[in-house]
UniProtKB/Swiss-Prot annotation:
This is Isoleucine--tRNA ligase 2. Binds 1 zinc ion per subunit. One of its GO terms (cellular component) is cytosol. It catalyses: tRNA(Ile) + L-isoleucine + ATP = L-isoleucyl-tRNA(Ile) + AMP + diphosphate. The gene is ileS2. GO terms for biological process: isoleucyl-tRNA aminoacylation. Zn(2+) binds at residues 922, 925, 942, 945. It comes from Burkholderia pseudomallei (strain K96243). Catalyzes the attachment of isoleucine to tRNA(Ile). As IleRS can inadvertently accommodate and process structurally similar amino acids such as valine, to avoid such errors it has two additional distinct tRNA(Ile)-dependent editing activities. One activity is designated as 'pretransfer' editing and involves the hydrolysis of activated Val-AMP. The other activity is designated 'posttransfer' editing and involves deacylation of mischarged Val-tRNA(Ile). Its EC number is 6.1.1.5. Belongs to the class-I aminoacyl-tRNA synthetase family. IleS type 1 subfamily. L-isoleucyl-5'-AMP binds at residue 598. It is an enzyme of class 6 (ligase). It holds the Pfam family tRNA-synt_1. Keywords: Aminoacyl-tRNA synthetase, ATP-binding, Cytoplasm, Ligase, Metal-binding, Nucleotide-binding, Protein biosynthesis, Zinc.
Length: 967
């Protein structure tokens, strides 16, 4: 065969076997930007159904990490696959730019004490640098999107829109000022949202403390059997926050629970009866039950405040008291606990902060004023011990909320803040996003009622709370995976009123003026907010910092402007209104978004914030579906941590293996669970990639001289195996489309790999090689095979392009012969072959027969009956119905099984017999053919090869055909 090698159709392709991705990929990133591929995609999709993906913006601080890469690549896969499916897929990337981390960084670099405008300017410059840095890294991953119009929450227009959007929520009566316990970080010097908390193990000082009975006679009368009070009596509470003891305002009991009075060596102690034995066992003291009373019978009893000797506190009914731990009696400090505060508010019991914003005890507290928390706790415990009310002190390890930025334990302390109420009723219905200004009637509390022509024209919607509206809004929203719904529902049910105010400088301001005496809002707040927004839109938030109330006609003697800024979760949670529904943007997509896609921690974060803002303003969710992905862990299942040294840099993967390897790992990992990554795992991904790349290379080689405009064979002239290959290609496309549509990217990678390795590499391409290599170059048999391969290659590239974006584009450039063309400009509908169920049914029998043939050939080879399969002749015995199905394909079976011949015989069961063929072998194609005869030169050639050589000789004598691209 070697002397005939040059006469075979062995084509070359510029698509190399080795990907060399780290070197090739950056050039494609530059090309996509220079050729405005995303903009051309949008132009090509004009008039198609829209598919809008909103971007949960990453924070503009530091390099991107592997979690960022997972999130953004998943979004990119969604975007590209929706375009391929025939949608006008839209994604505007963006960044979250305000907040404490950047402000803290500026303080580190420039010190504290700078004027607000200077802080804001430096923060803005720093945030911009960070976004540009992250932009480069994101683009390196192959992300397509509207990058020229990427948003930053610090954009002047976006900041102004946020003020207008907040006013819409306030105008519905959902924004209020209140004194409530909030999560407080002493390092941030600010309140924190629930989403800004991380739970970590903490060892606290836990104490059992007694609250002494003030009136023994009253106390004794509350028990069914009046006890003898020959010792001091006290109700015992248990707390892991002894620093709140000076703030104790009451003791809570469960109304229907039994409480026992127990005689112990030092005192008479009251605790819940079901918890008594465990408690006294832990104390190691003898005890005897003296009397019983229900919790409701103890309500109203006066007790001595444990820290302040002359102060009394009452026993109250508390519905949240449980009997699974502690003493069944709860220490209530309304300034330091949400449930405590709400209960005491209803009962008219006041509370006061005992710790300031810096984490020190209030200066006016005796003995502990001004002390740091740890020192003060030691003094409190010592005082209780000296007073005889310390029952027990012990270390207690538990999960405790920490600041997600500083990793330090937070405090619960009552501060005046602004809240969005979860349980305030308001009328539902989508608000007009363009109507920010309303007239109002404002009461002393500052809560406003909307009055206006637009409202009068609208039919009033149902009245619901924000919590109920949020529950209803997600009722029909699909979640991927479905289990994520429970997390969202739990977030809604357990979410307290949203504290949206922060005590920082770098943030969008609360744009309100309040009275100096009663803190009520200015009656013209709506108009004033619009005036402020106009200035912010021109000059940014610095306009608020330098604004004097008098400039807007506000009496500075009566009113002052707020100094609080908005929670950054409000910034990002409102982008559906401030960015995606901004009338100033030429094309912002539809509303609500078709998909929100973020990590599993975002149910409390961006998902929750977006849901609450959407329902607060419009009574609906800003998304139609939610996809949640898991966190990245190492190969041993451990969380990524710098201290463990197991972090994986997406930049390093892109620079050493290629971004397509990272993308393939992301797509081939079940994102619904934790996503494991390691060098070993990536190496397996590389092997999968190589097999797929080799398939692409084979396909490109064998259509290199094919131009469908001149060379395509009509469907009626295709061999039946080619029609079958196209039918299987359509099945592959349909399966990929379905998997992409349900966001099952793992299924797509399995389909693509299986299609390359089994359907193509393991069947069709093997069957084609002889026809491709040895047939007449422009003969109908070879062109028929190339017609099928051309369609297969186009559809395979479109199907893998959302995942293997760089490789698919590299291959498409060769395939199309035009660098201006892009695989991302094409859809399945343009290229997918029509369904052909009849071909599938015919060839199902061949595929079922193939394992029997393979086994028989292996046995014959093992018995040294044959060497190559082409030396074999097969006798296929099968039932009549199988033979009837195979009969029309009889002429193609030898080529499909790569044997010299196939004979069909009737039998009860399928069986395959192998014999060595007596036919001579063609020296050019190596097929054993009856037509093989000696050439004049003495060479043994089959009729087909003689014809091919003759055609080749005539072609060489004539003018050579001009080279054409493969399309």
């Amino acid at each position: 065969m070697s002397e005939y090698k040059e006469t075979l159709n062995l084509l070359q392709t510029p698509f190399p076997m080795k990907g060399d991705l780290p070197r090739r990929e950056p050039a494609l990133v530059e090309r996509w930007a220079a050729q405005r591929v995303y903009a051309r995609m949008r132009a090509a999709a004009a008039g198609r159904p829209p598919f809008v993906l909103h971007d949960g913006p990453p924070y503009a601080n530091g390099d991107i990490h592997i979690g960022h890469a997972v999130n953004k690549v998943l979004k990119d896969i969604v975007l590209k696959s929706r375009f391929a499916a025939g949608y006008d897929a839209q994604w505007i990337p963006g960044w979250d730019c305000h907040g404490m981390p950047i402000e803290h960084r500026i303080e580190q670099l420039h010190g504290r004490g700078l004027p607000p405008e200077a802080v804001q300017r430096l923060c803005r410059e720093y945030a911009f640098e960070q976004t540009e840095r992250q932009r480069r890294d994101f683009l390196r991953l192959g992300l397509l999107g509207d990058w020229p119009h990427a948003f930053r929450t610090m954009d002047f227009r976006t900041e102004a829109n946020e003020l207008r959007f907040l006013e819409r929520i306030r105008a519905r009566g959902l924004l209020y000022r209140g004194q409530k316990p909030v999560n407080w970080c002493v390092d941030c010097q600010s309140a924190l949202a629930e989403a800004e908390l991380e739970y970590a193990r903490k060892t606290s000082v836990a104490i059992h403390a007694g609250l002494r009975v003030r009136d023994p006679v009253d106390f004794a009368s509350r028990f069914r059997r009046r006890p003898v009070l020959d010792k001091p009596a006290m109700l015992v509470v248990w707390t892991t926050t002894p620093w709140t003891i000076p703030g104790n305002a009451a003791a809570g009991v469960r109304a229907d629970a039994p409480y026992g009075l127990y005689d112990t060596p030092g005192a008479l102690i009251v605790v819940a009866q079901p918890l008594a034995d465990a408690l006294f066992a832990s104390l190691g003291v003898d005890h005897a039950l003296c009397a019983l009373a229900r919790g409701r019978e103890l309500v109203g009893l006066a007790l001595g405040q444990p820290f302040f000797a002359g102060r009394d506190v009452p026993v109250v009914e508390a519905e949240f008291v449980t009997l699974d731990a502690g003493t069944g009696i709860v220490h209530l400090a309304p300034a330091h606990g949400a449930e405590d505060a709400e209960l005491c508010r209803r009962l008219g019991i006041a509370g006061e902060n005992v710790v300031d914003g810096a984490g020190r005890f209030a200066a006016d507290l005796p003995e502990i004023g001004g002390l740091p928390l740890a020192d003060g706790i030691a003094r409190i415990v010592a005082k209780l011990r000296a007073d005889g009310t310390l029952v027990r002190e012990a270390a207690f390890e538990h999960a405790y909320p920490h600041c997600w930025r500083h990793k330090t334990p937070i405090l619960f302390r009552s501060t005046p803040q602004w809240f969005i109420g979860m349980d305030i009723e308001c009328e539902q219905g989508e608000a007009d996003p363009g109507r920010a200004d309303v007239t109002e009637e404002a009461g002393a509390t500052g809560e406003a009622r909307k009055v206006g022509k637009a409202e009068e024209a609208e039919e009033a919607g149902p009245v619901k709370t924000l919590r109920a509206s949020a529950r209803d809004a997600i009722a029909d929203v699909p979640f991927y995976p479905p289990s994520a719904r429970q997390r969202m529902e739990a977030m809604i049910d357990g979410r307290p009123d949203w504290c949206v105010s922060r005590q920082r400088t770098w943030g969008v301001p609360l744009p309100y003026f309040v009275r100096r005496d009663d803190r009520s809002l200015h009656p013209r707040s709506a108009r004033l907010v619009e005036a402020v927004a106009a200035r912010v839109e021109r000059d940014g938030i610095a306009a608020w910092s330098r604004l004097r109330p008098a400039e807007l006609g506000v009496d500075e003697n009566a009113y002052e402007k707020l100094s609080d800024t908005l929670d950054v979760w409000f910034d990002s949670g409102s982008i559906h209104a401030t960015v995606y529904r901004d009338a100033a943007r030429a094309d912002t997509g539809g509303y609500p978004a078709d998909l929100y896609l973020e990590g599993a921690d975002q149910h409390r974060g961006w998902f929750g914030a977006s849901l609450m803002t959407g329902c607060a303003a419009d009574g609906r969710a800003p998304f139609r579906a939610i996809l949640t992905h898991g966190f990245v862990v190492d190969g041993a299942g451990r969380k990524m941590s710098k201290s463990l040294g197991n972090t994986v840099s997406p930049q390093r993967i892109a620079d050493t293996r290629g971004a397509d390897i990272l993308r393939l790992w992301i797509a081939s990992t079940d994102y619904a669970a934790e996503m494991s990554i390691s060098d070993e795992i990536l190496e397996r991904v590389v092997e999968t990639y190589r097999r797929m790349r080799n398939t692409l290379r084979f396909l490109l080689q064998n259509v290199a001289d094919f131009d469908p405009r001149d060379d395509a064979v009509p469907a009626g002239q295709l061999l039946d195996v080619d029609r079958y290959a196209l039918a299987r290609c359509r099945e592959f496309v349909d399966a990929c489309r379905s998997a992409y549509a349900r966001y099952d990217f793992l299924a797509v990678t399995r389909l693509a790999h299986g299609y390359c390795a089994e359907e193509l590499g393991g069947f069709y391409l093997d069957a084609l090689k002889d026809r491709l290599y040895a047939s007449v170059a422009d003969g109908v048999e070879r062109r028929a095979a190339q017609t099928a391969l051309h369609s297969v290659l186009a559809n395979l590239l479109i199907s893998i392009a959302p995942i293997l974006s760089f490789t698919a584009e590299e291959a498409w450039t060769v395939f199309a012969g035009d660098e201006r063309d892009s695989v991302f400009l094409h859809t399945w509908d343009e290229h997918a072959p029509p369904p052909d169920d009849a071909a599938l049914a015919r060839w199902a029998h061949v595929r079922a027969l193939r394992p029997h043939v393979t086994k028989a050939l292996e046995e014959a080879r093992g018995a040294a009956l044959i060497g190559r399969s082409s030396e074999a002749e097969l006798v296929v015995r099968a039932p009549r119905d199988v033979l009837d199905a195979l009969a029309p394909l009889h002429g193609e079976l030898a080529a499909v099984f790569i044997v010299a011949g196939v004979t069909l015989e009737t039998a009860d069961q399928i069986a395959v017999a192998v014999a060595r063929t007596p036919l001579a072998r063609c020296e050019r194609c190596w097929r054993h053919e009856p037509s093989v005869a000696a050439h004049a030169s003495g060479d043994a050639l089959c009729a087909r090869c003689r014809h091919a050589l003759s055609r080749r000789a005539r072609a060489e004598r004539s003018e050579p055909r001009a080279a054409v691209g493969s399309r």
